[in-house]
A protein has these predicted regions:
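Short amphipathic alpha-helical signal-transduction/dimerization elements
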Residues: 52, 145-153, 242-246, 280
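Amphipathic alpha-helical regulatory segments at dimerization interfaces
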Residues: 46-54, 98-102, 132, 225, ...
């Protein structure tokens, strides 16, 4: 008999949004990984299958229990196929362009898929994972840079100290504690009567409403400022965002939501899954404060 686990709050938010917009692909995390020309594709396929078999989170199936609550478990009997293709460069480009498609979170198909492609000039791995089973740490780090490389080189895969399923049970239990109730009361009072800022994005695309990105920021002056004032670069950028938002809203005090990685438990460092948390932020852009003091204030806000 399979054991059902609750969804993390981080997963639940993704689940609800996807149920509201089932045709959206904004929560698809897809990548095209160009492989070295001398790579052995048969060996790469074996390595890929080894990783897939080893990581239960990739086998996650979501279902509704008798009370209509979403629950998850690892369906190790459901095959996650690895596609193998030899095609022209033009065919490969068309294949990649059409690769991303909506997932049915309650359906029969796996929530990830993988394809190895070989053309006359390129070798590549194309893969897509739904955000409900993966985050940036998993998608960009643990899977391609650690597990896949180790498996290809014949090295053992690092074991997961704790699975997301176990952490989800712990999170559900914490919601019943006095500490959780006190934290909920703290945030309710802190943001009571405060309207959260809302920025209009660009025209809707396949990824939803997006904001145009620019590459004008240079890393060197940011690092120099942070070293001089003993602040973290992510907090400097968070403070800059808060200040810009304050100016756009024409309010000294501005509230908005941001994200944190959610892997505060060290036993989750090697764990596959979606741990990114949405957190509320309240910034006071006091014009009398220095930049360094404002960044320090933001750091305290995030603790």
């Amino acid at each position: 008999m399979k054991t059902l686990y609750p969804l993390l709050q981080a997963q639940l938010g993704v689940f609800l949004e996807c149920q509201a917009e089932p045709e959206s692909t904004r929560y698809n995390l897809a990548a095209r990984l160009l492989l070295p020309a001398d790579i052995d594709m048969e060996r790469m396929e074996q390595a890929l299958r080894q990783v897939i078999d080893a990581r239960k989170m990739l086998h996650t199936r979501i279902m509704l229990d008798e009370e209509g609550r979403p629950r998850q478990y690892a369906d190790m009997d459901r095959e996650i196929p690895v596609g193998k293709h030899k095609m022209t460069d033009e065919e490969a480009d068309a294949f990649v362009d059409a690769y991303v498609r909506p997932y049915d979170l309650l359906g029969e198909e796996p929530l990830c898929h993988f394809d190895l492609i070989e053309t006359p000039t390129r070798k590549m791995l194309v893969y897509d994972m739904h955000h409900i089973i993966t985050d940036g740490t998993t998608f960009l780090g643990l899977f391609p840079k650690q597990d896949l490389e180790n498996a290809y080189q014949g090295k053992p895969l690092e074991p997961e100290q704790k699975l997301l399923y176990d952490y989800a049970v712990e999170e559900a239990q914490k919601k019943e504690t006095p500490a959780y109730a006190a934290a909920a009361d703290y945030y309710q009072k802190k943001f009571e009567g405060i309207e959260f800022a809302d920025l209009a994005g660009s025209k809707p695309t396949r990824m939803g409403n997006t904001i145009i990105l620019h590459d004008e920021l240079k890393a060197s002056p940011i690092k120099a400022f942070c070293e001089k004032n003993q602040v973290k670069d992510n907090m400097l950028l968070q403070a800059a965002y808060s200040l810009v938002l304050s100016r756009l809203c024409r309010q000294q005090q501005v509230a908005y939501t941001s994200v944190r990685h959610g892997r505060f438990d060290k036993s989750l460092c090697q764990t596959y899954g979606m741990f990114v948390m949405t957190v509320p932020v309240l910034a006071d852009a006091n014009p009398n404060m220095s930049v360094a003091d404002f960044v320090s204030r933001m750091t305290e806000e995030w603790k």
